[in-house]
Amino acid sequence: MSLFDFFKNKGSAATATDRLKLILAKERTLNLPYMEEMRKEIIAVIQKYTKSSDIHFKTLDSNQSVETIEVEIILPK
């Protein structure tokens, strides 16, 4: 992999794969009642300050006690 490949846009297949991983990871995690509400609040705050509606959450790592979530924000031009 070269440095130029790092900045290359993903194809639709890679994007679909990432979304499927997110769905599967979410189903495997502990079902904490406040997690979905917290995600909604985070989205509202990000939209308030960036005017972006393109916000994605990704679960990076999950085990029985810890869930790591990455937030990807596409800023408008």
UniProtKB/Swiss-Prot annotation:
Organism superkingdom: Bacteria
HAMAP family assigned to the protein according to its UniProt record, in alphabetical order: MinE (MF_00262)
UniProt xrefs under Pfam families: MinE
Alphabetical list of Gene3D superfamilies matching this protein: Cell division topological specificity factor MinE
Family under the similarity heading: Belongs to the MinE family.
InterPro entries the record matches: MinE (IPR005527), MinE_sf (IPR036707)
Protein name: Cell division topological specificity factor
